[in-house]
Amino acid sequence: MNAYDAYMKEIAQQMRGELTQNGFTSLETSEEVSEYMNQVNADDTTFVVINSTCGCAAGLARPAAVAVATQNEHRPTNTVTVFAGQDKEATATMREFIQQVPSSPSYALFKGRDLVYFMPREFIEGRDINDIAMDLKDAFDENCK
């Protein structure tokens, strides 16, 4: 592994930890994503964070995701994450399930294997964190009862 890849892996591990230390399962291979998505129950809800090393992921996407996923009255059955730019195959496989234009960071909410909500980077970057959290809260309240 070259110095750049080693550095990025170290940084990404800390950023991944912001989610995994709060109950998110990190899916790091294509196989893990496929296995997870193919075994999820039809009535389960899954909140997916497509993580990134960018500033809007650090200052907005991860904090909003953790706050709402851990504190909202209505919460998804499962919370998972893939890391764009780090776990490339896992992210590509998750994006096949999402069926939206690739975007990171971003959020997806599934009911079973059906996408019921998606927030791309353009609705995260430059917004107030409270507005992002309220959008997630509304999606959870509607779909995670």
Curated annotation (Swiss-Prot):
Pfam families per UniProt: Disulph_isomer (PF06491)
Biological processes annotated in GO: cell redox homeostasis
Tell me the InterPro entries matching this sequence.
BrxB/BrxA
* Superkingdom per UniProt: Bacteria
NCBIfam families noted in UniProt: YphP_YqiW (TIGR04191)
Give the protein family.
Belongs to the bacilliredoxin family.
Name it. Bacilliredoxin SAR1441
